Amino acid sequence: MVNSQILILFILSLTITIVMCQTFTYSHGWTNGKRSTSLEELANRNAIQSDNVFANCELQKLRLLLQGNINNQLFQTPCELLNFPKRSFSENMINDHRQPAPTNNNY
């Protein structure tokens, strides 16, 4: 009697474990078999995206330094400022903040 209960408990726990592992595998996007896109396309797409996005500012600065693009202002700029997207300002907004030209030609 005790042996049969232990066997039933073992089979039940094994079944639950297998179901949980299968759910974990499929919930994280793991696939078996052929992928829909080739590895070259995937690598090219990831390379383009990583070049366009400043995911890690310090690595981007290091890459520019190693390529020989030395710009001291860029290296001293905080990464928080580099992560903001560029804004397009209207001409009226630019004119509102523009300094007036001097009238006596003294710059």
Swiss-Prot record:
Record flagged with keyword Transcription regulation: no
Biological process, per Gene Ontology: neuropeptide signaling pathway; positive regulation of heart contraction
Organism: Apis mellifera (Honeybee)
Record key words, sorted: Amidation, Cleavage on pair of basic residues, Neuropeptide, Pyrrolidone carboxylic acid, Secreted, Signal
Protein's recorded name: Pro-corazonin
Propeptide: 88-107
Modified residues (Asparagine amide): 32
Annotated function: Cardioactive peptide. Corazonin is probably involved in the physiological regulation of the heart beat.
Residue positions, PTM Pyrrolidone carboxylic acid: 22
Taxonomic superkingdom: Eukaryota
InterPro entries reported in the protein's UniProt record: Procorazonin (IPR020190)
Membrane-traversing stretches: none
